[in-house]
A protein has these predicted regions:
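Carbohydrate-binding surface patches
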Residues: 195-224
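Hydrophobic, well-ordered secondary-structure elements that form the walls
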Residues: 81, 154, 212
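Catalytic cores of secreted or luminal carbohydrate-active enzymes
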Residues: 150-192
């Protein structure tokens, strides 16, 4: 596929839409042939504000040092990053706030069990922001539409890469309306119910608006 990225970026800006690009980390040096800084500089020059490096190596000290350089060079060129795959937050964002979030927790595309997703707020989220790549509405794996939407409130992270497994966004109504209205940063948080692996209900406030999200396992329960 031949894609004129500068033209796509220009068209998006014309419509008031920014572009976040997925970049396969395997093509970047030393794992691939392309120089990281040259790629970042080129994309920034085209007007790309955000990147999502994926398939990144993160299992050794050398890998993490490479990731730190990746983030540092992105900061130099004023690029926001969301690191995909297995890297778990380790405090790097304190130095480089352009690292908005990262996956590192078995994202939704892996179709994890509900018990896994109900443990994340008590485990993975303790170390930093998390992009779970939630599905806007799949109706799969015994999950309901509201369960999927609640992740946008419960999971901590200023960027959630919401997936649409069925294609056209025009077929969604209230899901899309909620997605467009839910904030990405919060002023206050209250935990209303918390049973690791079973259920979690959290209220978050942005300005004067409160949002409440609840996720539950297969057992019915009433929360007051």
């Amino acid at each position: 596929i031949q894609l004129d990225l500068p033209e796509v970026i220009r068209y998006g800006k014309e419509k008031g839409v920014g572009l976040s690009l997925y970049v396969n980390g395997g093509v970047l040096k030393p794992y691939g042939d392309h120089d990281v800084e040259l790629v970042w500089k080129t994309l920034a020059g085209w007007g790309v504000p955000a990147l999502k490096p994926g398939f990144v190596a993160c299992s050794s000290q050398e890998d993490i040092q490479w990731l730190r350089n990746l983030v540092a060079l992105a900061a130099k060129h004023k690029l926001v990053l969301n690191i995909h795959d297995g890297y778990i937050a380790d405090g790097m964002r304190r130095t480089y706030p352009n690292l908005l979030t990262q996956e590192g927790g078995g994202g939704r595309e892996t179709r994890p069990p509900v018990t896994h997703e109900l443990m994340l707020p008590f485990t993975r989220h303790l170390v930093g922001a998390h992009d779970h790549t939630p599905t806007l509405y799949s109706g799969q794996d015994g999950r309901t539409k509201l369960y999927e939407m609640a992740q946008l409130v419960i999971y901590h992270g200023a960027r959630q890469s919401v997936r649409n497994v069925y294609g056209s966004r025009n077929q969604f109504g209230e899901e899309l309306e909620f997605l467009e209205s839910v904030p990405t940063v919060w002023d206050a948080v209250r935990v209303l119910k918390a049973e690791p692996g079973d259920c979690v209900v959290i209220a978050r406030r942005n300005g004067s608006r409160w949002f409440i999200g609840g996720m539950n396992d297969e057992d019915a329960r009433t929360v007051k």
